[in-house]
Amino acid sequence: MGTLGFVLGTAAMDHQQVLIDQLVDQVKNTPADDTFYYLVPNHIKFETEINVLAGLRDRQGLSGSDRFASSRVQVLSFSRLAWYLLRDTPAFQKQHLSKIGMAMLTSQVVQEQASDLRLYASEVKQPGFIQKMTAQLEELKNANITADDLTDIIYRVKSANDPAANQAWLAKMYDVETIYHAYEARLRDRYIGNSELYRQLVSYLQKSPEVAKMHFFIDRFAQFTANEQQVVDALITNAASTTISLTLDRGYPDQNHPNPQELPPKNNLFYSSAMQFHRLWKFGQMHQKEVKVLQNVAFATTPRVDAELQQVDSYFKRYASEPIGPGEREELLDPQNIQFMTTTNRMTELNNVATQIRQLVASGKYRYRDFLILSRHLDGYQTMIEPVFAAHNIPVFNDHERLMDNHPLVTLLTTLLELPQRGYRTADIIQLLKTWLLVPRTGTGDLMGLSDFQAAVFTTENWCLKQAIEGKNAWTTNDPEKIKQLWQAPGTNLTDPKYEQSRLEKLNDQLALVKDFVANHLLPVFDQFKQAQTGQELATALYQFLAAMGVTDRLYAWQQYQSTRDLDLARQPQQVWTTFCQILQEYVEILGQQELRDGTNEVLADFSELLQAGFAAAQYSQIPATLDQVVVSETGIVQSENRKVVFMIGSTDDVMPEMQESDSLLTDQDKDILSAYLDEDFQYLPGTAIDQLIDEPFVHYTGFMNAKEQLIFSAPQSDSDDKELSISPYMHDMARYFGQPVREYPLATSKAGQDNAIDFVSAPLATINRLVEVSRQIRDEQGVGIDRQPVMPVGWQTVAESLVKLAKQWQQSADAKVQAEGISLGQRLSLVAAGFHYQNKIDSLGNKLAQALYLRAAPDDERGRVLYASISQLQDFYINQYEYFLKYGLRLQKRDELTLSNDRIGTFFHKAMETFVTTIRENNLSFADLAHKDNQMQRDQLIDHALVTAQENQPTLLRLINSSAQAQFQYQQLTAIVKTMLITLCRQAEYTGSQPVKTEVQFGRIGNQQPGNLGSLDYPLKDNHHIYLRGRIDRIDNLKQGNNNFLTVVDYKSSNHLFDLTSAYYGLSLQLLTYLNGLQANLTELETNNPRLAGALYLRLNNPTIKAAELKKSSLDDLKLKEHQYKGILLNDPQLLRELDKSLDKQAFLYPLKEYKNGKIKANKEALLVTPQQLDWLQNMNKELVINAGNQILSGDLKLNPYRLLTGSNRRTGLDYSDFLDVFQFDNMLDQQNYRDLNPNLAKEAFDNVVQDDDEEDKK
């Protein structure tokens, strides 16, 4: 008969000491062939083994330096116990299915059962569904609920007409039951999972005679799963002795509390442990033939923690069970050992913790392994932990799980297998190459140099975007003409002697390298995939492809590279490859002999899903790189008990305590219904959110009590998104009870931080970071410019001097490593010092270099050299002078992509409009006549002709349209807009006397084209230079009135544009006025009698959306007309305006004007009516802007001076749409003085002054 004993005590007591004492006693007093097993959670197995063996050694009188081992004692987890006892049994020889294999098996089952599912049929393809379903199935197995049990429960629920179980619940349970039955059928007799493993262990414990000689000590388990509970029950009834340690202040019952009916209330801190104890005690009483329950419970009475932690232990036990009055106080023996603080944010919090750890270790009283940092959840800190602790030069081990699903090998596999289904998109092929795991081989068979291949891939990526290369055929073509068209740079002449060693040759070689690699080495693998008949053949083809392509060589190279830098990163390639091999092995085991269905794309998609499911379940193994390091973990994870100091970070009220939300497929309500039909002694599901909330105090309590000497609470005041956070009630109430302040840890830049530099001294790098922050703050406070030094606080001045001194000491060290660190520190200090004097200023080019850069010779002109410029270039100059230099001096360009960009759309629009207007004029047709229904067929033919001509004008457009469905849709929208606009043009002619007379009128030379229809705008500059301004007017309309011909300029826009006086005044919008000046300078060339300028207008090209409610007021055609009004500048001549829009007396269709009953015509904000004098003033202003820009450009004195215009709540700057922000390095905090602030009122005042001057002139 075996025995069942308990060791109880709070977390402040040393349970392990009692267990080891009992272990030593039993080892001495039992036969030599008896064996002993010390069972703990897997997370702490290694450290517990060290502690237990050390305890055994000490009790045998051996010193710490003596070697010690004990073959009779094993420290194991439950899973390792199963392996240890079953490793030679037939059951254990079955294929062991890992989490990855389970996920793959679930994925396969779900795919097969998808058509039979009621609720989940639409979710089977959703990301994460397979993981959730796998977890749910395993949860049911761990709860000892079989598929047959589930079927029986569903039947009983239906029979009982349980009102809680509605149709949705039944549908969900039907789906789970369907999948579960298929899942169990696949597992049965072939595989062994964790649940089956535990069942086999229970069977072994019940049948093997060897178990009667085994003694078990179970420690540090707060609760057992149903499977673990079965194992414990089997140990109790079959082993020689079982001793269980629980964190519990008393037994239910025990020698001091004999009433077996007495149970604690749910608000008792140890409620879960008490219920666990009572269940085990009750089980022992029910099996008195097999086991004797020891009468007296052993209590751990030796404190494991210091006195202050014992005070916390007593306080929290009471705090969880009953309210403590706000006036109650208890004084800590040493307040330094229990601290409470808040910080500004999580980053400041981590830096504070790291600084304290660094300083405590520097005191010589602590090692890094003495510190444990805990948080309820580490998600908010995950990206900060490594860089912060690296800056403080603190070794850290983050045991938070890390998934493999973002590793380049995973990206390679998923992208490769999805290529056919996604149509061999170029973006996917480039992504595949950018994993850098697939590299071409040289003629010798070696992998080519990675840097050369990377350069070729980047070049090819840009080229493919520029040429809109898409699809398998584009990559695999052998047609010389297609290769020349798609894969050779324009101007390539292989027979030209100058071609060799040229940039063209290098470009073509890079393109050929990547194209050939993809066509001849990557894509052929899909032919091998097509030939695969079974799952095993498919897996073999994939493995052989990766091996042949040198993927293993690349992974090994990565491992070798990181082995001397970061051991954690160095282990990842091997772990990922091992995981991949395991996935393939389990895939072959599960699906290897299954014949693949027809349809390679679908087969590969399914295969990819299985691989992704496998990798999504895989994690990197967490192996500490060194024993002496700080551990970062989460509460709820069992920790070893040898940490002296615990930092509880993130102590905020949203997670301490936390109301957890279940993300499993079965909700808490689902589980509540299910639990009502379970055998509570044999089957039980994990606790619901309410159960977990009851356990929250205990979870945090065990976290607090990991500390032996100090417990430090820390809480950020705000989250990463600046959301305000409040401190935890646990932290607040404990601080109040012990009369301790919740100290706000100051920023280094605050007054307190400036006065106490010592609080921020850590490793050199982290200290420098704080020193920089303080120095900047002091400079701002003292108003110190870059040419002066601020007066630093004494403490920080000492810190700065100490860092310089330290750098010099290290540089003089005989140790080469220390010397290198000294040089690095010195360089960083020099860089920091220089940074305070850095200005984001642009050096002047000087006029000679500027003139050499910008000036060109003018043909047949001896007046000097000429600055050729376009309107958009000068607008860029006024937006930001430095951007002009980058674009037109250095000729920097953003990556060219063959897309339906604004430029290409504009070209298409203009060509279509030009063709339409020109054809009508050449055939002496009337725009107004074409608006009539009788001429609709002729008009449609003209529109089709215009569209064809516009498309032929851009040969690459057809290739772009055929490259993707998105481009096809965009083109359809584009042609619809053009059709709408051409019809609108005809309808507008019915309401105006103005007619288009010219389109696409070019003045000056554009690029390499022939000189335009009209001459350049030629303005003289300083030093006998000239600026030739070029442009293209979209349309010129003519209104004949008496002997005069009034000309208006029309500029097409794809978005809504208004003439903005302020933008025109400051040079931000030069187009309309420059067009007028260009037209005026060439009036004699127009062959028009008595030409006069009537205005300049924008016309928006769009297909407007008309609200249904508006159709009640006007017809659709009229509403469309009003949506296409001309907006801009017009002469304020009533007779002219009435001719321009003959509908003014009713409702203006063509212009944003309104004629009142008194005959006056006024414009709304979308048009500006001007007098001839005002128009002259605007044109002269425009001319001066052009001349000033030209002189400034040639002076070479260009500035980084983006404009800034504030109008009400609107803010516009010259940086809003720039492609060169990374080049500018413009800092909105430090470079405010570089903005060129514009006065929004100045232009209006100047414009109004023209009116006043005219009035005064009239009076004279």
Swiss-Prot record:
Q: Does the keyword Manganese apply?
A: no
Cofactor(s) needed by this chain: Mg(2+)
Q: Which UniProt keywords apply?
A: ATP-binding, DNA damage, DNA repair, DNA-binding, Exonuclease, Helicase, Hydrolase, Nuclease, Nucleotide-binding
The Enzyme Commission number assigned here is 3.1.-.-
Asked if the Swiss-Prot or TrEMBL record annotates the protein with the keyword Flavoprotein, the reply is no
What is the documented function of this protein? Answer: The heterodimer acts as both an ATP-dependent DNA helicase and an ATP-dependent, dual-direction single-stranded exonuclease. Recognizes the chi site generating a DNA molecule suitable for the initiation of homologous recombination. This subunit has 5' -> 3' nuclease activity but not helicase activity.
> What is its quaternary makeup?
Heterodimer of AddA and RexB.
Q: Can you say what this protein is called?
A: ATP-dependent helicase/deoxyribonuclease subunit B
